[in-house]
Swiss-Prot record:
Binding partners and assembly: Component of the large ribosomal subunit.
Highest taxon, organism lineage: Eukaryota
Subcellular locations according to the entry: Cytoplasm, Cytosol; Cytoplasm; Rough endoplasmic reticulum
Function: Component of the large ribosomal subunit. The ribosome is a large ribonucleoprotein complex responsible for the synthesis of proteins in the cell.
Gene3D superfamilies: 3.100.10.10
Molecular function GO terms recorded: RNA binding; structural constituent of ribosome
Species per Swiss-Prot/TrEMBL record: Salmo salar (Atlantic salmon)
The gene coding this protein: rpl18
Name of the molecule in the record: Large ribosomal subunit protein eL18
Record keywords, A-Z: Cytoplasm, Endoplasmic reticulum, Ribonucleoprotein, Ribosomal protein
Predominant subcellular localization, coarse grouping: cytoplasm
Amino acid sequence: MGIVIQHNKDRLVRPKQPLSEDITLLVKIYRLPGSKCSTAPFNKVVLRRLFMSRTHRPPMSVSRMIRKMKLPGRENRTAVVVGTVTDDVRIHEIPNLKVSALKITRRNRTRILKFVQIMRFVGLALAAPNRQKSVLLSAPRNARDVSRHFANAPSIPHTKPYVLSNKLRRRGSKLTYNN
C-alpha cells in the first residue's frame, strides 16, 4: 500500500483581518502603508492582537495592571492593553497611570477617571508612533473557567468534565476508558 499525502493540512492559517467590524478602522490605521505605524515592531504585535478572537484577548483587571506597572523601569510609561480593562473592588487606591485599552468597563470607568489618564488606540497611534514609552500588557489566557474542561483526558486527575447529571459524575470511574 502507498502513503497517502494530504496537503490540506500544510498551510499555516493566520487571520488577515479582524472578524469584528468595530476594530476595522483601528486596523486601517495600524496598517497604513508608508507610515511609522506600519514599520514599528510594537505596532505589528498590536496589529496581530487586534485580529485575535475574544478568547485570546482576555480581560485584564486593574489590580493586575497596577502590579505589572509597579515593576522597576515602568514608571511614567503607558500601559497598552489590547482588550478590556475590568474593575477590581479589592483595590481602594489607584495610582496615577496612563492606560490605552480597547474597552474599559462602565463601573471601572467612573472609578478610574479620577486617577488614570485614558487614551484610545487612535490617539496612541498618533501621539507616539514608535511607542518608546509604552508597555504592552496581556492577561492570562487560561484563566477562564472553560479552559479547565479542555485541559486533559477524562481519566486524568483534576480534569473538569461536562456532566450531564450527577449520577454520571458519581459513576465517573466506570465511564472512563481503562486498559
